[in-house]
């Protein structure tokens, strides 16, 4: 097991500043680096630190960051989820690490979960200087995920999304929707999503539980599955067979389209199980084995 340090890292993205934690093994002169960020509306303290710690103990550097508008990063309105800007944040972090002398910029690995799992697949299809990708329960097809949304609630959600988008154009305060709610209109309306999301929240960090509704329409249109055929680096893809937010058929199709570069796992779990107990241990063990196979510690 490697000893490591954790240092704050701040990187400019557009007019704002991204806040990150930089985990650096003490025993590795120029380690490979794993870049990590959360999925929909998540802070880096929401069960991602446990992954980062295990990677660092195994000898890998880790950069775990919050998107603009979130957590320790700057930007207003707070808690805005912009797919376009979050993808820009991933590119910014990768470009920053390419110039950083303390890590091996030839060995950059992307790690994403849920929505950020879709991001890292998208980025891997675009960037040619990334060496591997790990995507757990990735969001791969918004159009297919939308079919799991309660049909009677969809028109209202789309209307609020449109109103918030137009309001944002003229400087109005955001119209928000809860991320999860057991009874009211929200982004993730299933019962297991409500319980699952509540299980990853860290009460020591501010989180309102609501985000601007303008995201809803863009989320439906976001389809990383359309780009994954362009990926030609090793991909670890972990899917949840009983995921109520991401159709398992979409995960299977995406993995098929990445072949022969994909190592696909389909486990008998729900979307949020992977952050907890035995599923977390299985996930981190699988991810470390994948890293050992394709990246390694020198």
Where are these regions (language model features)?
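Catalytic active-site module of serine/aspartate enzymes centered on a nucleophile-bearing elbow/loop
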Residues: 267-298
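Alpha/beta-hydrolase-fold enzymes
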Residues: 121-201
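Conserved alpha/beta-hydrolase
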Residues: 54-74
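Conserved alpha/beta-hydrolase "acid-adjacent" motif
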Residues: 244-250
């Amino acid at each position: 097991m490697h000893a490591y340090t954790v240092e704050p890292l701040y990187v400019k993205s557009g007019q704002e500043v991204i806040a990150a934690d930089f985990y650096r093994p003490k025993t590795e002169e120029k380690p490979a680096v794993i870049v990590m960020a959360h999925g929909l509306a998540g802070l880096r303290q929401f069960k991602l630190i446990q992954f980062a710690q295990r990677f660092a103990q195994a000898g890998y550097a880790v950069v775990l960051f919050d998107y603009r508008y979130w957590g320790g990063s700057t930007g207003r309105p707070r808690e805005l989820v912009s797919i376009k800007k979050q993808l820009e944040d991933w590119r910014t972090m990768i470009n920053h690490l390419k110039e950083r002398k303390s890590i091996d910029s030839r060995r950059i690995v992307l790690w994403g979960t849920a929505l950020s799992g879709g991001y890292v697949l998208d980025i891997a299809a675009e960037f040619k200087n990334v060496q591997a990708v790990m995507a757990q329960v990735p969001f791969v097809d918004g159009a297919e995920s939308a079919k799991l949304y309660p049909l009677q609630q969809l028109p209202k959600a789309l209307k609020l999304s449109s109103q918030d988008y137009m309001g944002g154009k003229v400087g109005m305060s955001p119209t928000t929707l809860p991320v999860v709610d057991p009874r009211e209109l929200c982004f993730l309306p299933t019962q297991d999503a409500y319980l699952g999301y509540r299980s990853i929240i860290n009460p020591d960090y501010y989180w309102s539980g609501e985000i601007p509704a303008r995201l809803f329409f863009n989320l439906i249109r976001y389809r990383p599955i359309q780009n994954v055929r362009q990926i030609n680096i090793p991909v670890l893809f972990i899917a949840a067979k009983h995921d109520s937010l991401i159709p398992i058929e979409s995960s299977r199709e995406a993995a098929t389209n990445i072949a022969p570069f994909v190592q696909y796992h389909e486990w008998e779990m729900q979307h949020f199980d992977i952050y907890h107990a035995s599923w977390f241990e299985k996930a981190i063990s699988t991810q470390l084995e994948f890293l050992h196979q394709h990246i390694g510690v020198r």
